[in-house]
Amino acid sequence: MASADIAAPDFKDAPYWWEAAPPSKAAVPALPDRPEVAIVGAGYCGLSAALELRRHGVGVLVVDAARIGNAASSLNGGMVAGSLKIDHAELARAFGPARATALLEESARCLTFLEELLEREAITCHYLRTGRFVGAHCPSAYAGLASRVETIKRLTGADAWLVPRRRQREEIDTDHYHGGMVAEASGALHPALYHRGLADAVRRAGALVAEETPVDAITRRAGGFTLRTSRGVVEAREVIVATNGYTGAVMPWLRRRLIPLGSYIIATEPLPPETARRLIPRGRMIVDTNRVLSYYRLSPDGTRVLYGGRASFRRATAREAAPRLHAMMVSVWPELARTRVTHAWTGNVAFTFDHVPHMGVHDGVHYAAGCQGSGVAMATYLGYQTALKIAGKSVAPCAFDALPFPTRPTYTGDPWFLPVVGSYYRLRDWLERRLAA
């Protein structure tokens, strides 16, 4: 099928998730003059922080530049991870063995924390503990998964196991991979429904949420901070910046430490039920070991493939990226070559130079960011931990708090180097697959 023919008649440049939970435009409350805590960013992290602060009686104002539900928290793939993407050896080299162990152990707690939050707040978002299949793009990648299995089991207590190529079709109906790994500690949800449910819980708890209220500047003053917004000036005792892949000039120090990267997703037209069940028979979340990775799943109702990946390292619209994603999907399942696309969308994720999420304080301003494209559970958890810290309720320091946070000389937050790095990664992935053919 030619790239021009992949679009279904009802194609939309919008997330599939918005069919069930479009961004809502709530009445914008009058901004309080002096909230105890002002939170910039109403994604998972900011809302989670607001909810926990209200549980401890702290007055909270959450502001966001866009409509609530219009950014990454409702644009992702709805995959819920319970581990970091970096192994213990790399973490130990950067932070020492003890801190490396603490980071991996605490990252595993993110999944349980999210599950408890969903139950406590009665958030209905099609959550399931599905497990995750990681497909090896070449034999050496499969061999490398063995150490990941051992690390996951030893340090997190979660189950994980290798799947040899001869048994691969028990997990995914393709010969595209050279075996893989299943990690039990992983789940799936509807990200827009989760975000809406979290925002509703925050409002019920008594926090003020003001959308379409961008913050132009944060200035330190005696006893707190002044925030200059599009709707007036607000003074707060504490400030949290929770803008992740959309961090701008409001906090230049943080922006210099984050690498925003566009991630793209397509949704197919509905498939015959028996076809969808055969493609991913156990309903796992699927990712691969490519440097330019793909991630995909079935929709919550089991009727469509939602296929995501790094389709472009340059600025591209979702419509422009859709043909590449479609081709990537067909490389896994050639039978879907004539399956059309009904939705395509994109949103920013944020990476860091050390491949680790961070929370901390700079010049008095709290921040949490850099979830490496796996922020559904991690961003929620870091928001919670930041709130505990502000409220003085932390039982123990969070392992992700106050880590050295690197940047690079002359880097200002515009990742000009991504097209070059992306092309290099694509070439290496291609060569490894070619040699394995």
Regions found by a protein language model. Name each.
Residues 1-37:
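Extreme N-terminal leader/targeting segments of oxidoreductases
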Residues 35-62:
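N-terminal Rossmann-like FAD-binding beta1-loop-alpha1 element of flavoenzymes
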Residues 55-75:
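Glycine-rich FAD pyrophosphate-binding loop
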Residues 84-166:
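Dinucleotide-binding Rossmann-like beta1-alpha1 core, especially the glycine-rich loop
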Residues 104-111, 135-144, 181-200, 210, ...:
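Short beta-strand to alpha-helix junction loop
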Residues 112, 120-128, 215-217, 233-363:
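Active-site substrate-recognition segment that forms the wall
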Residues 151, 175-237:
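Helical element adjacent to the flavin cofactor pocket in flavoenzyme catalytic cores
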Residues 315-317, 322-431:
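C-terminal catalytic lobe of FAD-dependent flavoproteins
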